[in-house]
Amino acid sequence: MGLFSFTQEIAIDLGTANTVIIHNDKIVVDEPSVVALDKRTDKLLAVGEKARLMHGKTHENIRTIRPLRDGVIADFYAAEQMIRGMVKMVSSKSHWFSPSLR
């Protein structure tokens, strides 16, 4: 590591019910582990609470997924999209540098 670090280090706790992201010993994201995807394109539409609110109340072409079951990743694509979406929540709160994914 050099004199200046232009990245943020974060910790992610993937849970079956909630996903938590910690930065500088503070919880910065605590959202339900849910994603909403377009059935036709597999495009990510919503993550976390926004996706949970869409469950059962949206168009038939939108599906909500809980990517973790019994503490294990059950849908790798949905889990990846969920992590990417939640990391974006962290970087939107910090205007300088994006988080470092390791």
Predicted ranges, named:
Residues M1-S5:
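A short acidic-Thr-Gly-centered motif at the start of a beta-strand
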Residues T7-Q8, P32:
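Short, surface-exposed beta-edge/turn micro-motifs
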Residues E9-D13:
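Short glycine-aspartate micro-motif
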Residues T16-R102:
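Conserved phosphate-binding loops in N-terminal lobes of ATP-dependent enzymes
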